[in-house]
Regions:
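Solvent-exposed interaction patches of small proteins and small membrane subunits
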Residues: 1-91
Length: 91
């Protein structure tokens, strides 16, 4: 991955999602109510969505801009469209 994102910011978000996943595993091991587990699953889903947004924003701000400035507009836009399509399928 190019240096198009703030790795430290992304790492913090990823660690938060990992913590939430570990909490889900613990809840399952402790037979927590399904409703509470689902709340945590939704929190992880939201965290992963925010991670994806950070990556997309960085890609747009840096990689797409650089590609267009370098004269590779068509390929750059096609790559961004593909990335956006993949991200939108995650929800």
């Amino acid at each position: 991955m190019h240096k198009c994102i703030d790795s430290d910011k992304l790492r913090v978000r990823i660690n938060k999602a990992i913590g939430q996943l570990n909490a889900i595993q613990k809840m399952i091991d402790e037979n927590a109510p399904c409703e509470q587990v689902l709340v945590q699953i939704n929190a992880v889903k939201g965290a992963m969505h925010r991670i994806g947004l950070i990556i997309l924003q960085g890609h747009l701000s840096h990689c797409v801009r650089e590609g267009i400035e370098a004269g590779d507009a068509e390929e750059t836009i096609a790559n961004f469209s593909e990335a956006l399509e993949r991200f939108s399928r995650l929800s």
